[in-house]
A protein has these predicted regions:
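N-terminal-biased segments
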Residues: 1-8, 57
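A structural motif
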Residues: 7-25
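Surface-exposed cleft-lining segments at the edges of enzyme active sites
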Residues: 24-37
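Phosphate-interacting basic helix/loop segments used at nucleotide- and nucleic-acid interfaces
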Residues: 38-49
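Charged catalytic cores and adjacent phosphate/nucleic-acid-binding surfaces used
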Residues: 4, 16-20, 33-34, 47, ...
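Divalent metal-dependent hydrolysis catalytic cores, especially in the metallo-beta-lactamase
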Residues: 28, 54-57
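N-terminal processing/targeting junctions
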Residues: 7-11, 52, 112
């Protein structure tokens, strides 16, 4: 939040930026423009994700906007991503040819749902020993018999 520009969200095309709690109760509205780019480079972002126990997955890489490839045009060498997410609009085989020519990064699919009817339109199956973040991380790396299933 501190790395966002101090611009207000008062443009007519900006919808309410709701602040909610864990019970989905509205606590208020953010006056700051949350769609703006943060003053962080991509290496710092991935490092923060990993430091906080998360998985760094470049989302909807096949989209013409709001994706790693639309912004940079490539994966920077040394960027420690855990996976690349492809929308249902592109086949995984085609995405493999276009975005990453080897198996160094797994390709995954998620719903990226913005409306209830879109939930479940895409998914990824994993072989895990337990339902934990560490197991997901191991599956992304293909270690210890864990894996990401390509469909």
């Amino acid at each position: 939040y501190r790395k966002l520009p101090e611009a207000e969200a008062n443009a007519p095309f900006i919808k309410d930026q709701v602040i909610v709690n864990q019970d989905d109760e509205v606590l208020g509205f953010s006056p700051r423009f949350l769609l703006a780019a943060a003053a962080l480079n991509i290496f710092d972002i991935v490092q923060l994700i990993h430091r906080n126990g998360g998985l760094a997955i470049a989302s909807h890489i096949d989209r013409e906007s709001f994706s790693l490839f639309s912004q940079l045009g490539f994966i920077p060498p040394g960027l420690a991503l855990d996976a690349l997410e492809v929308t249902p609009l592109m086949s995984l085989a085609h995405a493999r040819r276009v975005f990453v020519s080897d198996d160094s990064l797994p390709l995954v699919r998620f719903s990226d749902s913005h409306r209830p009817e879109e939930i479940g339109r895409a998914w990824t199956e994993f072989r895990l020993a337990a339902k934990t973040w560490n197991e997901l991380r191991r599956a992304m790396k293909g270690s210890g018999g864990r894996k990401v299933y390509r469909r």
